[in-house]
Structures are given as C-alpha cells and as structure tokens.
Amino acid sequence: MKTIKVSINSIDKVKQFVNDINRYSYDFDLVSGRYVIDAKSIMGIFSLDLSQPIDLNIHAEGAELDEVLKTLSVYEVE
C-alpha cells in the first residue's frame, strides 16, 4: 500500500479522478480526518472537504503501483 496526497477540488476533477481510478481493479481509499471512503465512489468523495488535499491510500504494489502513480500524478500534491 502507498499513500499520496491528492487535490480534487472541482467537480470536473472529481469526475475525471473517479474515471481514472475505476480503470483499475485495486482498492483505493480517501482519508480526510477521521473519515475513510471508497475513492471509486463519486458520492462519497463529494461528502468530503475538497478544499484541502486528501490522503489517497492505494492498495497495489510493484509495477502495477508504478502505473497507477503515473496515471494519478496530475492530482498529486506535496
């Protein structure tokens, strides 16, 4: 598992983010404070405070993880 910070602070970004991660069969969780939601759930994402970067837990390893990180690099923040 790897954790990165992502910024998905607009409706269009949320829709594109969900489309991007739904291409993979791995589990993705968004963590905001004490809330953990399935990152593939567009309704769940909209229940979070999107004005701040959110932790994304990626449950993949090896070459698969590298591919996922490349796809999600447009959302990643420091």
Which ranges hold each PLM region?
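Short glycine-/aliphatic-rich beta-strand segments at the starts of folded cytosolic domains
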Residues: 1-7
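C-terminal structural segments of small proteins and small subunits
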Residues: 49-78
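N-terminal intrinsically disordered, cationic/polar leader segments
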Residues: 4, 18, 22-24, 29, ...
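Short, well-ordered coil↔helix boundary/capping segments
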Residues: 8-11, 59
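Amphipathic alpha-helical interaction surfaces in cytosolic regulatory modules
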Residues: 11-27, 35-50, 64
